[in-house]
């Protein structure tokens, strides 16, 4: 990924697509939103990136774009759990929009301070057709057997409306990109998700999406929900993680991979816990998950970010929740807005430190 960032920073016109897949920490778009804004401030705005094809849950509020739906049915794939069944027709967003009512619409509106989009990409499966409208520019998209289709407006627009025309259409994702160059960061998170949910995504759909999106970096941000599973099998989890790394490398061979180690999180209702009130402590499986993630990353050559350590280590979730200006919610699992900005800034700073070190080594070699 650093090579791609270097080309972009040098004015080479290359775009850098970062794709983060994970759980509620990713779905909320507050941590990824901070990282996106910071990277785009330095390297340029490559667009909002990939979004679910609808409003997947109440309170959905992605940064940089407003999404509204009218008679538009959006379905979240059931969580895989321990069964791990493959969810046919479900791609990396974990969401399907099944349009059975002609005239149903989905509208995406960019923030006014952002560059206008120059390409609209939709991924789905027919036989139904989709109308894509940006003001008075209108296109009709047919997916047939499935895939991703792009349209390029001739003029500047900040709003796009998708309208179902006929028959049944399954839409998997929507992508908005800006002018060539800059960073595009897509946050594809599902509340409650584990790595098994990524494993359950339809292989054919995922292959088509990754071929179209061409990410420079894929970030895996799972682990919290596995850590609250007292029956976690460490060997099975390690095999699953290794398998998903192999899968992503096969489907996106040009992408770098990074694992965000599971952050600190606390469970309520314990005795003699590490929290200030003694009632909370990390679930035992959380350290197991983190150890597997770190060890596998080192073994297979995947970047690893120590989220747990960078937020303060053991029981930091309690300290961050009880500080003068809290950075975490009272559940000691999720970050609030201020905390998301803080930890997103820490991640950005660490990435830039690594990038500068890489640039210095490359300059010395030349």
Question: Residues of each region from the PLM?
Answer:
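Conserved SGNH/GDSL esterase-like catalytic core that processes O-acyl groups on lipids
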Residues: 25-243, 250, 334
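Short coil-to-helix leader/linker segments, especially the first N-terminal amphipathic alpha-helix
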Residues: 1-7
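Active-site beta-loop-alpha junctions enriched in small/polar residues
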Residues: 190, 223, 262-264, 310
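Short hydrophobic beta-strand that contains or immediately precedes a catalytic carboxylate
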Residues: 18-22
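Surface-exposed patches in mature extracellular/periplasmic domains of secreted proteins
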Residues: 27, 42-54, 257-260, 306-307, ...
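Catalytic His-Asp segment of secreted/periplasmic serine-dependent ester chemistry enzymes
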Residues: 203, 264-366
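Loop/turn elements at helix/coil->beta-strand transitions in domains of secreted/extracellular proteins
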Residues: 14-17, 181-184, 213-218, 252-257, ...
């Amino acid at each position: 990924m650093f090579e791609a960032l270097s080309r972009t920073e040098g004015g080479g016109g290359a775009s850098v697509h970062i794709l983060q897949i994970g759980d509620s920490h990713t779905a909320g778009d507050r941590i990824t939103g901070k990282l996106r804004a910071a990277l785009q401030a330095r390297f340029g705005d490559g667009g909002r990136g990939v979004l679910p094809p609808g409003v997947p849950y109440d309170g959905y509020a992605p940064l940089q774009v407003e999404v509204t739906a009218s008679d538009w049915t959006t379905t979240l794939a059931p969580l895989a759990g321990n069964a791990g069944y493959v969810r046919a027709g479900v791609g990396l967003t974990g969401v399907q929009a099944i349009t059975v009512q002609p005239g149903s619409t989905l509208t995406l509106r960019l923030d006014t301070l952002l560059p206008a989009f120059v390409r609209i990409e939709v991924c789905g499966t027919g036989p139904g057709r989709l109308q894509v409208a940006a003001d008075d520019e209108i296109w009709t998209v047919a997916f047939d057997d499935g895939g991703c289709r792009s349209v390029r407006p001739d003029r500047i627009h900040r709003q796009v409306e998708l309208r179902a025309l006929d028959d049944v259409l399954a839409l998997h994702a929507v992508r908005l990109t800006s002018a060539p160059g800059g960073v595009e960061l897509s946050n594809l998170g599902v509340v409650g998700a584990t790595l098994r949910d990524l494993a359950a995504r339809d292989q054919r759909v995922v292959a088509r999406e990754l071929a179209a999106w061409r990410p420079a970096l894929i970030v895996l941000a799972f682990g919290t929900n596995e850590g609250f599973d007292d029956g976690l099998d460490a060997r099975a989890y390690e095999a699953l993680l290794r398998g998903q790394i192999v899968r992503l490398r096969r489907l996106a061979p040009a992408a770098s991979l990074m694992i965000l180690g599971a952050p600190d999180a606390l469970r309520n209702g314990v005795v003699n816990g590490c929290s200030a009130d003694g009632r909370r402590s990390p679930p035992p499986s959380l350290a197991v998950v983190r150890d597997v993630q770190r060890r596998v990353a080192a073994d297979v050559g995947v970047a690893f970010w120590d989220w747990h350590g960078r937020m303060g280590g053991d029981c930091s979730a309690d300290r961050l929740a009880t500080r003068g200006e809290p950075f975490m919610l009272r559940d000691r699992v999720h970050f609030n807005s201020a905390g998301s900005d803080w930890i997103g800034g820490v991640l950005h700073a660490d990435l830039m430190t690594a990038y500068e070190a890489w640039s210095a080594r490359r300059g010395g070699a030349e």
